[in-house]
Amino acid sequence: MANQDDKIKIITDNRQARHLYEILETFEAGVQLLGTEVKSVRAGKVNLRDGYVLVRNGEAVLINVHISPYEQSSEYFNHDPRRTRKLLMHKKEISKLIGQVEQKGLTLVPLKMYFKGSWVKISIGLGRGKKLHDKREDLKRRQDQRDMARAMKR
């Protein structure tokens, strides 16, 4: 039986990342947040669409992810919505990411943010950017699968 701590509640999903990138591998990381940020995340006020992950000075950082200011807090105690946030990962994982990003020219993109128990986690994907013809192939393949499913239904 699952513990209360093991429950996963998805907050937001970056569906556009799977369209723009071919995801080769995924990683889970914790996110270092302020109190008002956690409250906004619980309210679901997060946008991952423009975000990306960089490795600076041996630390993974989440850049350009918008977490809206907490509405019930005063302006003085609130946070900057697009501030750089540190990701909490093991050094071994970070060194693996550094090697793959630098050698193969891959990109790190946030895929989804979720609560795992009471901790905010983020799933990041190591991906290669898709070209226009790759995107068209994916759309065509999905449309063909829908057509086949409709034909089988009849």
Curated annotation (Swiss-Prot):
<dbReference type="Pfam" id="PF01668">
    <property type="entry name" value="SmpB"/>
</dbReference>
<protein>
    <recommendedName>
        <fullName>SsrA-binding protein</fullName>
    </recommendedName>
</protein>
<dbReference type="InterPro" id="IPR020081">
    <property type="entry name" value="SsrA-bd_prot_CS"/>
</dbReference>
<feature type="region of interest" description="Disordered">
    <location>
        <begin position="135"/>
        <end position="154"/>
    </location>
</feature>
<dbReference type="GO" id="GO:0003723">
    <property type="term" value="F:RNA binding"/>
</dbReference>
<dbReference type="InterPro" id="IPR000037">
    <property type="entry name" value="SsrA-bd_prot"/>
</dbReference>
<keyword id="KW-0694">RNA-binding</keyword>
<dbReference type="GO" id="GO:0005829">
    <property type="term" value="C:cytosol"/>
</dbReference>
<dbReference type="InterPro" id="IPR023620">
    <property type="entry name" value="SmpB"/>
</dbReference>
<comment type="function">
    <text>Required for rescue of stalled ribosomes mediated by trans-translation. Binds to transfer-messenger RNA (tmRNA), required for stable association of tmRNA with ribosomes. tmRNA and SmpB together mimic tRNA shape, replacing the anticodon stem-loop with SmpB. tmRNA is encoded by the ssrA gene; the 2 termini fold to resemble tRNA(Ala) and it encodes a 'tag peptide', a short internal open reading frame. During trans-translation Ala-aminoacylated tmRNA acts like a tRNA, entering the A-site of stalled ribosomes, displacing the stalled mRNA.</text>
</comment>
<keyword id="KW-0963">Cytoplasm</keyword>
<comment type="similarity">
    <text>Belongs to the SmpB family.</text>
</comment>
<dbReference type="GO" id="GO:0070929">
    <property type="term" value="P:trans-translation"/>
</dbReference>
